[in-house]
């Protein structure tokens, strides 16, 4: 499908503003950013013992807003850099930048504006450490991963996953002004979760990545090798998911959830390795989302109920 010509985007003035808003909103990758903010919120909650005060709640809400703004800025910058790649892939061809609906200067200004506003919010209303860690995460994702690693190496997800694993650290820093070992455990869980999550997606989208010229693992090393890596990573992830219980960050409720979810993820990966199908790869990818969301939700419930 050819990108829509500029004239096709013209609408009556009454409809122009909502359409433009939806385009900018799409640039922020809302679903991804929602998961980022959720993981940051878990770090915030675990950093505060007992029932939070109103001041704690206020600080957490402000921190979530600042992190959302900077995460949205990173997503928009990613769309700007990868617009030609996105246009070649079915999964991303709908993005406004890929369709030529937003100019490069406008997209760059939008990304810079969100980043500046979010950084200001975090620096002034939260603390400088959180601002600098969040800005470093922006650079890690938008520049190191998107510009350098992704088009260069099949290990892009492994190395670049460090920026994606930062949200709980940001949340912890927001509430305490420091980075505790508990935050690093949450970082480790997301860091190890990221490769099998993305490689499951890459397995059934391999032709998209091949057409776009991206050296994702299934493109460079083949289907079978990637399936094995997905399975092995879920095995390494399993004990990491038990660490919050081992180090007394959580109780039995989280332990039960972590064991069941980890068995489920490893089970999906085992089936994927032994008997591949696109449908099973898609199912594994979707379960990985359930795994992380439910795991952190269990941490949240355990913190208040046990």
Curated annotation (Swiss-Prot):
How would you describe this protein's topology in the membrane?
Answer: Multi-pass membrane protein
Sorted UniProt keywords: Cell inner membrane, Cell membrane, Heme biosynthesis, Membrane, Transferase, Transmembrane, Transmembrane helix
State which pathway it belongs to: Porphyrin-containing compound metabolism; heme O biosynthesis; heme O from protoheme: step 1/1
Q: Which domain of life is it from?
A: Bacteria
Supply any other comment: Carbon 2 of the heme B porphyrin ring is defined according to the Fischer nomenclature.
Which PANTHER family does this UniProt record tie to the protein?
A: 4-HYDROXYBENZOATE SOLANESYLTRANSFERASE, PROTOHEME IX FARNESYLTRANSFERASE, MITOCHONDRIAL
Q: What is this protein called?
A: Protoheme IX farnesyltransferase
The taxonomic lineage of its organism, from the top, reads: Bacteria, Pseudomonadati, Pseudomonadota, Betaproteobacteria, Burkholderiales
Instruction: State which gene encodes it.
Output: ctaB
């Amino acid at each position: 499908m050819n990108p829509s010509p500029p004239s096709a985007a013209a609408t009556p003035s009454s409809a122009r503003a909502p359409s433009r808003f939806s385009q900018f909103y799409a640039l922020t990758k809302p679903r991804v950013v929602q998961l980022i903010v959720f993981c940051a919120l878990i770090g915030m909650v675990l950093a505060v013992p007992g029932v939070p005060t109103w001041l704690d709640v206020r600080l957490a809400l402000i921190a979530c807003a600042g992190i959302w703004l900077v995460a949205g800025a990173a997503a928009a910058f990613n769309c700007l850099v990868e617009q030609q790649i996105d246009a070649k892939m079915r999964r991303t061809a709908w993005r406004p930048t890929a369709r030529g609906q937003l100019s490069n200067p406008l997209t760059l200004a939008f990304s810079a504006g969100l980043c500046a506003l979010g950084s200001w919010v975090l620096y002034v209303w939260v603390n400088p450490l959180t601002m600098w860690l969040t800005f470093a995460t922006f650079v890690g994702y938008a520049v190191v991963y998107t510009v350098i690693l992704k088009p260069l190496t099949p290990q892009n997800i492994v190395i670049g996953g460090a920026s994606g694993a930062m949200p709980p650290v940001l949340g912890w820093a927001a509430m305490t002004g420091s980075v505790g070992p508990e935050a690093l455990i949450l970082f480790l869980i997301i860091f190890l979760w990221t490769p099998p999550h993305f490689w499951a997606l890459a397995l059934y989208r391999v032709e998209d990545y091949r057409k776009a010229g991206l050296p994702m693992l299934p493109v460079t090393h083949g289907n079978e090798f990637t399936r094995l890596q997905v399975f092995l990573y879920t095995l390494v992830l399993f004990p990491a998911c038990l660490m919050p219980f081992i180090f007394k960050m959580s109780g039995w409720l989280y332990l039960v959830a972590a064991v069941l979810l980890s068995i489920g993820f490893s089970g999906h990966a085992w089936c994927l390795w032994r008997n591949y199908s696109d449908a099973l790869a898609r199912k594994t990818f979707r379960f990985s989302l359930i795994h992380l969301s439910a795991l952190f939700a269990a941490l949240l419930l355990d913190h208040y109920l046990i």
